[in-house]
Swiss-Prot record:
InterPro entries: Ribosomal_L11_MeTrfase_PrmA, Ribosomal_PrmA_MeTrfase, SAM-dependent_MTases_sf. This is Ribosomal protein L11 methyltransferase. GO terms for cellular component: cytosol. It is found in: Cytoplasm. It comes from Shigella sonnei (strain Ss046). PANTHER family: ELECTRON TRANSFER FLAVOPROTEIN BETA SUBUNIT LYSINE METHYLTRANSFERASE. It catalyses: L-lysyl-[protein] + 3 S-adenosyl-L-methionine = N(6),N(6),N(6)-trimethyl-L-lysyl-[protein] + 3 S-adenosyl-L-homocysteine + 3 H(+). One of its GO terms (biological process) is methylation. GO terms for molecular function: protein-lysine N-methyltransferase activity.
Length: 293
């Protein structure tokens, strides 16, 4: 069904109040959007992180009389008569279908392709990972995932054990298996990620070589030849003592989910245990790799 969208611009401090006002005026959902496309990362648990200059967008049923909505909002102390706003009629679309139509096969490195499960593979002779991300993070479109996939493609993983720490959709663990790893272990705090990884592993015929664990269930003394963690800078720093013991002596470590401006602080958390390589950047993101001492 079609919808009507009303957009207000405000400060982060006032965004929650205006969100409540829109809901009281009949909005069925509210979205906060950064006016200037400023990245925001790592909100605290339970925190709604807002920007200094925030668009508050209310979605209304197509039958809503927006003149009545505007009249209600004009009585709000933060708005007043003639407040600035924008009203748009949204086209009736199958949004899930549109997303699927825009997700195309992507190549990473020399051998590896990530292909949506609903599309044909572009190269039958390549290493093809068929992916349906479901509700979990990880499609290959984000620079951090791309950096990790390119790194895995550059390695000789034949017969190796790989740990994907924060596995999301399972894209990195499954790619490692398709690239020749003997076994991969995926760890994630989200049960939905575990299920998405399991489904994608079955789709790619590697489920018998993929072990999946919530952190509370992971085996003690777990070790791997290659460890990859594409999460966020804060957790990478905080979990450095745990992540650093996962690679065997001489094993490889790959970290991403890190802004280039955060690279130095993440490196400091690992430099005592690893011989680190030069940081590799892609757009505003980066990848840190190294070999266990």
């Amino acid at each position: 069904m079609p919808w009507i969208q009303l957009k207000l611009n405000t400060t982060g401090a006032n965004a929650e109040d205006l969100s409540d006002a829109l809901m009281e005026a009949g909005a069925v959902s509210i979205t906060f959007q950064d006016t200037h496309d400023t990245p925001v990362f790592e909100p605290l648990p339970g925190e709604t992180r807002l920007w200094g200059d925030t668009d508050v967008i209310g979605l209304f049923d197509a039958e809503t009389d927006m003149n009545d909505v505007v009249a209600i909002l004009e009585n709000h102390p933060l708005l007043g008569a003639g407040f600035a706003h924008k009203i748009e009629q949204l086209e009736d679309k199958d949004w899930e279908r549109e997303w699927m139509d825009n997700f195309h096969p992507m190549r990473f490195g020399e051998r590896l392709w990530i292909c949506p499960s609903w599309r044909d593979v572009p190269d039958e002779n390549a290493v093809n990972v068929m992916l349906d991300p479901g509700l979990a993070f990880g499609t290959g479109t984000h620079p951090t995932t791309s950096l990790c996939l390119q790194w895995l493609d550059s390695l000789d993983l034949t017969g190796k054990i790989v740990i994907d720490f924060g596995c999301g959709s399972g894209i990195l663990a499954i790619a490692a298996l398709k690239l020749g790893a003997a076994k991969a272990i995926g760890i994630d705090i989200d049960p939905q990620a575990i299920q998405a990884s399991r489904d994608n592993a079955e789709r790619n015929g590697v489920s018998d070589r993929l072990e999946l664990y919530l952190p509370k269930d992971q085996p003690e003394e777990m070790k791997a030849d290659v460890v990859v963690a594409n999460i966020l800078a804060g957790p990478l720093r905080e979990l450095a003592p745990l992540i650093s013991v996962l690679p065997v002596s001489g094993g490889l470590l790959g970290l991403s989910g890190i802004l280039a401006s955060q690279a130095e602080s993440v490196c400091e958390a690992y430099v005592d245990s690893f011989a680190l390589d030069p940081v590799v950047e892609k757009e505003e993101w980066c990848r840190i790799t190294g070999r266990k001492n």
